[in-house]
Structure formats: C-alpha cells, structure tokens
Amino acid sequence: MMRSFLFSFFLVFQFQSFATIRLPAVIGSNMVLQQKSTVKLWGWGSPGEKVNVATTWHGLIDSTVVDGNGKWIVNLRTPAAGGPYGITIKGSNTIELKNVLIGEVWICSGQSNMEFSYNWGAPAMKKDVAAANIPAIRFFQVQKVTALSPQENLAGEWSVCDTNTVKWFSAVAFYFGKRLNDDLNVPIGLINASWGGTPAETWTPSEIVNRDPALAEASRKLKTSAWWPITPGYTYNAMIAPLTNFSIAGAIWYQGESNTGTASTYSKLFGSMIESWRKAWAKELPFYFVQLAPYTYGEKNIAALLREAQVKTLALHQTGIVVTNDLADDTTDIHPKNKKDVGVRLAKMALANTYSLPISGAYSPLYNYMRVDGDMVTLFFKNVGTGLRAEGRTGEGFFIAGADKQFYPAEARIAGSTITLVSKQVKQPAAVRYAFSNTAVGNIFSREGMPLSPFRTDDWEVDTSSVK
C-alpha cells in the first residue's frame, strides 16, 4: 500500500511541479499506433497553454488548448500500416517522438504464464531469440505497481524487438506478435501488463467486485501474498486504467491459476472483467484467452472446474479460448515451457476472427451435445474442422456414468466429427466426462491439430477435497 501511495504522490507532484507539456509513458518514441483509426494523443500542461501536434504521415498541424485541469487531448486519424514516422508536440516546450510505427496494437495481460519470459528458463526458445531482430515488433513493458484508485499514468517505455529485449518480454506475447507480423506484414505493438500470482479480481474495477455479493465473497477467500496483490481493482487501477485512452486492436489473456479455489464464480468474474475493459476502451475488444494447462494442484478437480468456467466465458461475443491440455511437459510445473504453441494458437485465432484470414486450425473443438441410444453415447462437437483424430488410444480420458453418478472408463470410436462411447459397466448412460481432472493430458484433436477442450455433460457436485 505504501508503494502505491508513493507512486500516486510522485505522479501528482510531477504533474504539478513543471509548467511544460508532458506525455504519458505509453506515448513515446518507438511506439506503435493503431492503424486506420482515430487515436488519441494526450498529456498535461499549463491551463490555457496552446498545444500543436504535427505528424510526418500527413504534414498537418492539429491544435488544442490545455484545459482548466491541466489536461489536453488531440484526436488523430492514422493511415494504413507503415512508418517509421515522427510526431512533434509543441507548447511552451517541444517534444519530438521518433521511430513511430503504425500497425496493430494488442494488450497482453494475466499472471505468471503471461509474464513468463525466455530469461525465466525456456531453452527451447534459444533459436527464436537469436533470430529476434524484428524492428517491426515493438514492446511496452508496464512496470508492476498497484493503486487505490484509477491512475492517469504508469511506468514503462517502448522498445524495439531485438535479441536482447525479447529475452525479458512475455514469451507468449512475443510469439503471438511474431505470427501476426508474419501473416499480416504490418508493425505489431505489444503492451504487456501482467503480474505473476494475481487473481482476476485485482484486474477488475473494484466496484464491480464489491457490489456483487457472490464476487465479493469469493474475493475474501483469496489467499494473501507478500509477492502479488489480491485486492479488487489494484492492478486495474495502476496498470490498465492509464492505458485506456491508447487505441488497441484487442487483448490476449493468460490467467486463472490463482482463481482455482473460487471456480464457481470465475465465469461471472471474468466476463465482468472483460466487459469492464471494453467499457473503458469504448470498444468491443476482441478478447482471446488461454485455458489452464494440466497441473498437480493441492485439491482435486479445481482446475477442471476453472477450465469449465473459462469455456462458459465464450458466451461473450468476440472471445476465444486456446486449449493447452496437450502442451504440459511436466504436470508438476505450473509454468509449461512451451510458450510458442500458446502464442501461435492465440495469433491464429486473432488472424481468423479479428482479421478474417482463412486460417486452418484456428479453433479447438468444443463439446456441443450428446445423444444416448441404449448403452451407447454419441458426442457432437463444434469447431471440428475436417474431423477428429486420436493420438494414442482413442478412449483415453473418456468416462461414462449412469444415474448412480459412478464414472467408468469408456471405449471410444471416432466417426468423422463425432465420437461414440460405450462402457460395459454402464447400461444406461447419463453423463460423460473427458479429461476432467487437474492433470489429464488430452489426446483427441481436430485433423488440423487443435486439441479437444476438456468437458463434462453433467452438473453434479465435483469432489474438490485435498489430494492425499
């Protein structure tokens, strides 16, 4: 709390102590501005001071006057992707912004699996890091800080992607941005605002959590830590709110591990968080997120329930989920090292859904409905592409239960886009589960290589007792 107070005090002191034109940290040299859109440039100055903004992409001068609160803002229309450009902002002083690109800008947020970089220990990235001199990709790393109320500025700066800067930046975000750059052939700006260990509550405006009894109660169950905040709104206020004037194309999100203990309210919380961000940006942002990978949690099935909650969030328009139950190299490590496939899958989803490109295997198969005929169950799915396939034994991971709610392993057969199941122990099937546990590794894929999301067809009570 003291750090938050000092940060806020510093910003106020800084803004009031100098009668010069100033910019927020996110507006600077090396930045990427969203193409073919109206973007905002804003800052602070002396009330009544005239501010002129000139850009090298159109050569015109846009003018405004600092208002009575010491703030100014200019709206600029950006052209199609290109650059580098320059921007000159002139008041009582002059600020020159150099090496500015225009392209696609994405915010990347969540907890440690989004924060995870090459320097955290990902030797498989070595070749990609060595080839990462990609000046068309730019990074903005938001420094980790909290605040009691929404802030107007934050700490961070833009940098050019190279073999050094990439080592410290989110691996998932890098691979996401690289695939976008490869396929769209436009500059990509990546803003990383992530913090390991954080629950979704702290990335959500506090009033949204506190005014909902169920969300407020769930937030009180979160485990405190000296290393990351858990208080509703704290990271939203300090790390997201200051960015909401900055035009972006969309958001990617990798989080959920710290909410496994409150999975029953997660879909409501997460959906509310997404809607709050969209309201803040005044845009229905595409929002693509990563499903939890297999991991040995201390309580049974809590990750399965959280994954289920993540899938429920797909009810929101312009959302998408990346399934990762095939990417866990070690289920005792909460940080799977394969970040490349995660980033690429996020990018393929964005390329297909946001940019309308014909991308094969952009979506994972999802359970749709089932049909029972005697002792046989037929499962139907969405997003199956050209069909389904199995790696290894087809029935692995499938379980059937009757009305007694006792689950037994099933024998499975794939027929194009459907799967049929039977079990000698279940004569009248009532429910099916697939990979529905903390550590289950999936082996059913679309023929395009995308893993089937874990699911259950029932809504029965799930055992979440401690693992012994």
Please place each PLM-identified region on the residue numbering.
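Cell-envelope and extracellular/periplasmic
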Residues: T20-K468
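Bacterial Sec-dependent N-terminal signal peptides
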Residues: M1-R22
